[in-house]
Amino acid sequence: MALIEGVGDEVTILFSALACLLVLALAWVSTHTAEGADPLPQPSGTPTPTQPSEAMAVTDSIRGEAPGAETPGLRHRGQAAPPEPSVGLAATPPPPDSPQEPLVLRLKFLNDSEQVARAWPHDTIGSLKRTQFPGREQHVRLIYQGQLLGDDTQTLGSLHLPPNCVLHCHVSTRVGPPLPPCPPGSEPGPSGLEVGSLLLPLLLLLLLLLWYCQIQYRPFFPLTATLGLAGFTLLLSLLAFAMYRP
């Protein structure tokens, strides 16, 4: 007696084996994960303290020498010692036009909308455009106090911008020239392996296998199984014709 009425046992066993193989393949793919790389050890920034024994050895060697003798070690240390600054000279203050904090800029557009940008004084006009408008820096014009900032190599520190200053921004919407059409023989093909394109060949291969089993083992295929196989063949033929027709 057949396991499923109207379907032969060979067909049932074949579909069961295919289902088991599919489940095993999905389980293997889901568990196939790459191990993460181990983090690199961070170098220790703690300096090694100086051993006190070295200082004691230097002191003992100095005491053992004669008072009038001059050792090479003392001469070397005397030459390497930096000169002490005189009392009358004051330290040079840092220049007032080199702030350490970033500049806060307000980019104002034609529709009165604003955008806050942060930049450093050593940044250039071109780097500011690339940071705030990636891919559109060629269509952006910055205006400060009625002057067009057209030199992209000019630094922000040279402009002496005050905090929270307003830079008027004009973004051009002009579209570039259209690209020439590609020749018929150089059309880019699909990249990568498409799973959908493999479904129809697999179904055709399975259909051929079923028809081979139906011919070789005709007693195991009743009339209902043969009619179902013929209907499936007709449906798959229409699908293949619809997909591959010019």
UniProtKB/Swiss-Prot annotation:
It comes from the Eukaryota. InterPro entries: TMUB1/2, Ubiquitin-like_dom, Ubiquitin-like_domsf. PROSITE patterns: UBIQUITIN_2 (PS50053). The modification Phosphoserine is found at residues 98, 127. Coiled coil: none annotated. Its main location: membrane. It is a multi-pass membrane protein. This is Transmembrane and ubiquitin-like domain-containing protein 1. The lineage of its organism: Eukaryota, Metazoa, Chordata, Craniata, Vertebrata.
